[in-house]
C-alpha cells in the first residue's frame, strides 16, 4: 500500500522542469500511461521501489518513441528490386526535386490555364502516356486493384465476365481476383482447366449476359509442363466478333525491353497496345518504376465511361502522384532510364555491381570477414515468377555472430540483407553508391571499432 500511495499525482508530476518543452495534452496522456503501468506492476509485486527520476526518464523515452516517425528510410540490401515490403519502386531524388515546386505551391491540378476555367486532373498525364503507348486515352487510379474494380463495376455490374480458371490469381494480402470481381458486382464465369484453356472455352461461355472477355496476367506464379493459354490478341478478335469488351489486367506490365530474357515472362504494354484493345491496366510502381498507381489505357469511349463512374471520386490520385508519374513517363519517353531507379538497378551489369561491392569490402576488410560473391536474385513485386537474375553480394561475418544474429544487428540499423547458404549477404543489385559509406559506418558500429 505504501508504494501505491507514493505514486505521484499527474497534475503535480507534469510540472517537472524537464517537461517544460513538451506539449501538455500529449504529456498528460503519456504520464497517465506510465503511472498506470507502475500501478499495475506494484499490484503484481513486480517492483519493490521506484524514484521520480526513473518515472521522468520513462515519460521522456515514451515521448521520444511516440514522436519518432514510424515510416523510416531503409537500405535495401536484399537484392529484390521491387520489394513489396520495402516500398516497391524508389523515386529518383532529382525527379522529386523537379516536382517539389508543384506540390508545395498552388498548381493547375484541375484548372485550364488557356481557358481560365475548371480543367481535368488526368489531362496532365494523358498526352505523355498516349504518345508513349499510342493509346487513345488514359485514366489513373490509386492502384491496379482499383483499376480492375472500376473497370468491372463500370462495364460488367450484374453482367458476366469470362476468365480462364488458370488466371484467377491471389495478388497478395489475400486479395483474390474472384473476390474483387464479386465486390464489383460482376458475375465471374470461369472457363477451361487450371493448366489448359482454349479459345473455344471462351466461345462456349459467351451468353446474352456476357459483357467482357478478361485476361489476367499470372504475375506471381507460373504453370509449366502440360499447359496452354489463349493469347490476348485472340481474345481481342473474339470480343470484336461478339461485340464485347476485351480487357487485360497486366499486373506489372513493362514499357521498355527488359534484360536477362525477362520479356518472355512479363507482358509488354507496347506489344499488346498494337492489338488496339478495348482496355489494359497495369501498376505504376512495379516495372514502370514510378509511384503507386493503377494506369488504365485504351479506347476513348471506354475511358470516358470510366470517368463518369462515381467510384472514381474515391479512387482518384492526388497532385503528388500525378506529378511524379508524369515525370517518370517523360523519362521513359525520352529514353532516360537512368532517371528511374528501378530500371537503373535492373539494367546494371554485374561488373558495375562488383565495383561497388569491392568499394565496401575495401572499407571494412580490416574489421570483419567479408567476401565478394556471385549470386542470383529476383525482381520482386509479384513479377517474373521463378526467374532469377545475376547479382553480386558481399558475405559479411563479424566476430562470432551467427548469420541470424548478423541479420538482426543490421536490421536494427535499418539495413535489410538476406541469409543464403548459412551466410549473411548484402546484395548490391539494390544498394546504391550513395549508401556504401553508410553501410561501412554501420559495420564499424556493430564491430565496436
Curated annotation (Swiss-Prot):
UniProt enzyme class: transferase
PANTHER family: L-SERYL-TRNA(SEC) SELENIUM TRANSFERASE
Protein name: L-seryl-tRNA(Sec) selenium transferase
Pathway the protein acts in: Aminoacyl-tRNA biosynthesis; selenocysteinyl-tRNA(Sec) biosynthesis; selenocysteinyl-tRNA(Sec) from L-seryl-tRNA(Sec) (bacterial route): step 1/1
Family under the similarity heading: Belongs to the SelA family.
One of the protein's GO biological processes: conversion of seryl-tRNAsec to selenocys-tRNAsec
Protein's cellular compartments: Cytoplasm
Assigned EC number: 2.9.1.1
Chemical reaction(s) catalysed: L-seryl-tRNA(Sec) + selenophosphate + H(+) = L-selenocysteinyl-tRNA(Sec) + phosphate
Amino acid at each position: 500500500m505504501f508504494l501505491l500511495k507514493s505514486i505521484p499525482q499527474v497534475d503535480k508530476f507534469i510540472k517537472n522542469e524537464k517537461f517544460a518543452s513538451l506539449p501538455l495534452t500529449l504529456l498528460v496522456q503519456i504520464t497517465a500511461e506510465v503511472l498506470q503501468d507502475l500501478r499495475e506492476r506494484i499490484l503484481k509485486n513486480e517492483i519493490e521501489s521506484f524514484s521520480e527520476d526513473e518515472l521522468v526518464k520513462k515519460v521522456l523515452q515514451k515521448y521520444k518513441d511516440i514522436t519518432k516517425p514510424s515510416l523510416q528510410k531503409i537500405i535495401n540490401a536484399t537484392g529484390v528490386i521491387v520489394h513489396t515490403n520495402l516500398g516497391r519502386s524508389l523515386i529518383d531524388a532529382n525527379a522529386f526535386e523537379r516536382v517539389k515546386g508543384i506540390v508545395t505551391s498552388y498548381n493547375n491540378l484541375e484548372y485550364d490555364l488557356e481557358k481560365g476555367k475548371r480543367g481535368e486532373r488526368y489531362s496532365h498525364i494523358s498526352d505523355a502516356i498516349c504518345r508513349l503507348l499510342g493509346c487513345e486515352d488514359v485514366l489513373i487510379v490509386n492502384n491496379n486493384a482499383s483499376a480492375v474494380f472500376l473497370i468491372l463495376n463500370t462495364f460488367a455490374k450484374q453482367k458476366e465476365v469470362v476468365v480462364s480458371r488458370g488466371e484467377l490469381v491471389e495478388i497478395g494480402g489475400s486479395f483474390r481476383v474472384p473476390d474483387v470481381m464479386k465486390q464489383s458486382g460482376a458475375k465471374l464465369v470461369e472457363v477451361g482447366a487450371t493448366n489448359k484453356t482454349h479459345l473455344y472455352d471462351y466461345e462456349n461461355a459467351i451468353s446474352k449476359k456476357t459483357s467482357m472477355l478478361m485476361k489476367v496476367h499470372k504475375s506471381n506464379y507460373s504453370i509449366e509442363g502440360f499447359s496452354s493459354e489463349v493469347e490476348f490478341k485472340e481474345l481481342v478478335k473474339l470480343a470484336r466478333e461478339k461485340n464485347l469488351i476485351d480487357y487485360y489486367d497486366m499486373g506489372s506490365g513493362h514499357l521498355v525491353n527488359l534484360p536477362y530474357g525477362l520479356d518472355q515472362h512479363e507482358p509488354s504494354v507496347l506489344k499488346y497496345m498494337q492489338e488496339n484493345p478495348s482496355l489494359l491496366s497495369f501498376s505504376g510502381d512495379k516495372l514502370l518504376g514510378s509511384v503507386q498507381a493503377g494506369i488504365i489505357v485504351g479506347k476513348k469511349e471506354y475511358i470516358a465511361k470510366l470517368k463518369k463512374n462515381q467510384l472514381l471520386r474515391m479512387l482518384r490520385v492526388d497532385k503528388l502522384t500525378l506529378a511524379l508519374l508524369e515525370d517518370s513517363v517523360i523519362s521513359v519517353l525520352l529514353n532516360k532510364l537512368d532517371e528511374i531507379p528501378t530500371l537503373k538497378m535492373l539494367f546494371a551489369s554485374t561488373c558495375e555491381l562488383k565495383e561497388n561491392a569491392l568499394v565496401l569490402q575495401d572499407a571494412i576488410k580490416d574489421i570483419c570477414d567479408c567476401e565478394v560473391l556471385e549470386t542470383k536474385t529476383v525482381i520482386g513485386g509479384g513479377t517474373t515468377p521463378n526467374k532469377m537474375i545475376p547479382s553480386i553480394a558481399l558475405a559479411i561475418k563479424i566476430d562470432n555472430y551467427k548469420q541470424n544474429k548478423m541479420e538482426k544487428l543490421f536490421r536494427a540499423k535499418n539495413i535489410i540483407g538476406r541469409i543464403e547458404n548459412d551466410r549473411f549477404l548484402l546484395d548490391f543489385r539494390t544498394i546504391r553508391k550513395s549508401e556504401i559509406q553508410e553501410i561501412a559506418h554501420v559495420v564499424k558500429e556493430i564491430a565496436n571499432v
